Amino acid sequence: MSQLDVLIVDDEESIRNLIAANLKDEGFNPKVAANSTQALKILSEKPVSAVVLDIWLQGSEIDGLGILEIIKKRYPLMPVIIISGHGTIETAVNAIKMGAYDYIEKPFNNDKLVILLTRACEVTKLKRENIDLKSKVIDKTELVGECSVTLKYKMAIAKAATSSCRIMIHGKVGSGKELAARLIHKQSKRVNNPFIIFSPTCMTTEKINQELFGELEKQANNKRPTILEFANNGTLYIDEVSNIPIPIQVKLLKFLKDQTITKPCGKNIKIDIKIITGTSKNIQDEVNNGKFLEDLYYRLNVSSLKVPSLYERKEDIPLLVKYFVKQLSKFSGLKERSFADETIAALQSYEWPGNIRQLRNVVEWTLIMNPLTTGNNEIIKPYMIPSEILANSANLTKLEDSFDMLSMPLREAREVFERQYLSAQMSRFNNNISKTSSFVGMERSALHRKLKLLSLHIPPTNRINDEEYEEANA
């Protein structure tokens, strides 16, 4: 347990130096701070293994409980041992509820503190190992997919992560805007600092104001840190930024100009954060309609990132389904199942208005509603997925219900089948001629001729080169 960094925060110099000397003799590497400013500066430079924190700090802007709250927000696993010379049972209980590892009263036996620190660091080490083990199976910042659209998107995220400018992420509901923000933070220089998510949706104007700036008159003496303070030195992601009311937009614009917030006590605090915003709306339309400040839009949209919809990433659906099945099996106790090729085809033919989130919900619903009847891995067939998916899967599943073809002559029935089959496959591969022809086993020019014969339209952007197209349609 040697050379573990321990931060000692106490306003009395003699006490903090005594604790530091004792801990150094026991093999720890102590650091000392007299107030919240010094303590938070040390933590921002390099997180420590544990903190010994006095509750009553004279001359400190934030008291011990306030520092504890900040630490548990920024560094959830960091153990904090509270010390106090004149505390109460109520204070001790509050500290434990807020996440303190333990509470001891001054004067205390040095051996007791060493035992507590050693135990706290061991427990934290086990927690970290457990989290690392889980992350090997499921990574919350893993972008699953290998199609060309996804690869380009991954490159755009990597490029955005190297920039220090503000980024606005545009994407439909459920497409993964928060994931994009997490990936940008994970690949940036701020990776070891806080990543804070703020969603103003369903909040009142007063609540948004309190969370961001902490300026409620009724709470003028409240020293609770704001969201901006929690995110200091890290990344703040504001989800659905267009839901912020105009009065708060004005304050946010002022903050972006000078990167400073004014506390109720009148003190100005400099904040260093990377701001990423997300929106499913057309912000330019919101500006034109007077619902969003134009200047704020330009300051937040310095760099723009578009999240592709699942409809644009249909080729990733097989990988996504496997990923969600494994995730649900690991953390929800559902049995792993394989999805039949025809089931995957049905999923690929659906338009997915709810994007990735909807696909995950469909996979979970399917596993729950179709429990294993044997100990074997029963294949998920098309009839097992939600009926609305089948009903809207671009006629793919209608092939199974075409009993009326039995009353047709062979040539007519074959034409009906080919039209339905090729229409479904074209939809499945986003009207991509090369991929569709490869899957169905036809030359591209032959597929073009067949589609023209069946009166199936091909978008110009998905045609082969003009020479080959003209030859196929000659």
Curated annotation (Swiss-Prot):
One Pfam family cited in the UniProt record for this chain: HTH_8
Keyword annotations of the record: ATP-binding, Nucleotide-binding, Phosphoprotein, Transcription, Transcription regulation, Two-component regulatory system
CDD domains documented for this protein: AAA, REC_NtrX-like
Domain Sigma-54 factor interaction, residue spans: 143-368
Record InterPro entries: AAA+_ATPase (IPR003593), CheY-like_superfamily (IPR011006), Homeodomain-like_sf (IPR009057), HTH_Fis (IPR002197), P-loop_NTPase (IPR027417), Sig_transdc_resp-reg_receiver (IPR001789), Sigma_54_int (IPR002078), Sigma_54_int_dom_CS (IPR025944)
Signal sequence, start to end: none
Positions of modified residues (4-aspartylphosphate): 54
Start and end residues of each Response regulatory domain: 5-121
GO molecular function list: ATP binding; ATP hydrolysis activity; sequence-specific DNA binding
GO terms (BP aspect): phosphorelay signal transduction system; regulation of DNA-templated transcription
Residues where ATP binds: 171-178, 231-240
Function, as annotated: Member of the two-component regulatory system RC0849/RC0948.
Full protein name: Putative response regulator NtrX-like
Species in which this protein is naturally found: Rickettsia conorii (strain ATCC VR-613 / Malish 7)
Upper lineage: Bacteria, Pseudomonadati, Pseudomonadota, Alphaproteobacteria, Rickettsiales
